[in-house]
């Protein structure tokens, strides 16, 4: 059996299967590998609004402390109460423009002023309207206490930095003798909102409130391309259980599991390029919960018991609300493990050092496009010894083609004898039939890892290279790079030995066309990497063939 041909056929076949699967997902059909009917339904369903979105106060211990199930507790269905109305307070800093609704003290809208959409408008992360629902909520449970349905009163004060380092919004709500004061502090240059919660028992009987912090979001994806998709949904982190993603589908089916109670960690909502997270005060015990609270509305949250408050007593606790881009180094400084919301897929072990090196190159070159090119050159240098050995093996295989063809013709009716003769030929000539495939196989994990680096890195978003490439995170608008890539792949196939099998030869000629069509929909940064990689491979192969030719000439001259 021609093992090399088999491996190439497998790689080509899998490429076609993945191509077809991406087309299926792009057209709204279930993936053959990752079916998710819940997300398809969520994408077409309107976001929850009114009482369904506003009156869904969580119940105490909605999630067991053991974390074995995430099914909603009995009685946790949305309440049909009328939605309260409140004042919309707009806070503006150099990084965000946030809207806080005094009806519940909810952060109901948040714009990222340094991140822009294609139309030039700021990216809107939090939003609550008839199309989208995504907001940060907090309140007290353990009785009829102030929660995210209570109308709060806002203290007067500045709502913009205006040269200051920070701006505060103080909200006060009272219900049944319990007063809750929320203090949101927005700081210059930060995507973190410091949140303080002061609870006072102004009644005549002891109370035992529990603070909840949650992120509520509809199940629709944003910025989903035809040919790639990243994780969208809740995530939970603790020091013991590490990073744990929870799909909307599993939550809807009651199959999602959450970590046990801890005195560390955080909860988050993740989407392509951006994330939000509630980070409670470290050292205080809290439990986690996830829940589907409407056909197209989900939440992930934390419940922190505040203990028993005697009449007149006050207890305070702090938390931080992050809402911003997935910039790895910034996330590392905010909370342990928060950088994991940047989804590198299953090759994180390779992707993280690749991004580290790419970032170092960017610090020197100042342009992400040139940094990708420089990284590609470095990767080729690392793989050069292996590639040189491989091309030498391919050169030997090319010299053996006439003898291999003769063996195939001689034993075409006896496959077993043909394989024996082939193996004998390989042993005699000291040729490894897999030698030519090795660089391809070795580079596939690196290619996939770099794919996830370029796909997941918000730094590529809006980053220009030169000329017509104004954004490395979106496809080439004029398809110039995919066409150049197709030409380079065609040249590569011409430099390789012609396969003896006519069908295989045709497949190798068609592959450049297939891959170029697929790369029409890939981010320009990724295609740039592949184009440069192909051009360097062509130059490398030409040089090695030249060296091999000189070596053969020297041998002939000596003989």
Swiss-Prot record:
Residues annotated as region Disordered?
Answer: 45-82
Residue ranges of the TM segments = 7-24, 338-358, 364-384, 434-454, 472-492, 507-527
Named from the GO MF annotations, one term is:
membrane insertase activity
The main place the protein resides is: membrane
Question: What is its membrane topology?
Answer: Multi-pass membrane protein
GO BP field: protein insertion into membrane; protein transport
- Superkingdom per UniProt: Bacteria
Which residue intervals are annotated with compositional bias (Low complexity) in the record? 45-55, 63-82
Example GO CC term: the record gives: plasma membrane
Tell me the compartments it is located in: Cell inner membrane
Instruction: Provide this UniProt record's keywords sorted from A to Z.
Output: Cell inner membrane, Cell membrane, Chaperone, Membrane, Protein transport, Transmembrane, Transmembrane helix, Transport
Q: Does the keyword Membrane apply?
A: yes
InterPro entries tied to this protein: Membr_insert_YidC, Membr_insert_YidC_N, YidC/ALB3/OXA1/COX18, YidC/Oxa/ALB_C, YidC_ALB_C, YidC_periplasmic_sf
The record's PANTHER family line, in alphabetical order, gives: CYTOCHROME C OXIDASE ASSEMBLY PROTEIN COX18, MITOCHONDRIAL (PTHR12428:SF65), OXA1 (PTHR12428)
What family does the Swiss-Prot or TrEMBL record give for this protein? Belongs to the OXA1/ALB3/YidC family. Type 1 subfamily.
- Function of the molecule: Required for the insertion and/or proper folding and/or complex formation of integral membrane proteins into the membrane. Involved in integration of membrane proteins that insert both dependently and independently of the Sec translocase complex, as well as at least some lipoproteins. Aids folding of multispanning membrane proteins.
Subunit (UniProt): Interacts with the Sec translocase complex via SecD. Specifically interacts with transmembrane segments of nascent integral membrane proteins during membrane integration.
Protein name listed in UniProt: Membrane protein insertase YidC
Gene name as annotated: yidC
